[in-house]
Amino acid sequence: MKLTCVVIVAVLFLTALADDSRNGLENRNEQERNENEMRDRRDCQDSGVVCGFPKPEPHCCSGWCLFVCA
């Protein structure tokens, strides 16, 4: 009886703390949209421009840097 009560309380507690992921896709799309807007706003280098060490800034617009922006 005590074990049953403990299990019920634990399940209720975990259910109350569970993450609501019903609109997870919507939130993910919103986050990607915000990242794209920030990428457009900041200064970035076009493809073919030297990037990376020893020149860490500015970043490549594509997000890929292999000694030159991809």
From Swiss-Prot:
Disulfide bonds join 44-61, 51-65, 60-69. It comes from the Eukaryota. Pfam families: Conotoxin. It is found in: Secreted. Expressed by the venom duct. Keywords: Cleavage on pair of basic residues, Disulfide bond, Knottin, Neurotoxin, Secreted, Signal, Toxin. Belongs to the conotoxin O1 superfamily. This is Conotoxin Qc6.2. It comes from Conus quercinus (Oak cone).
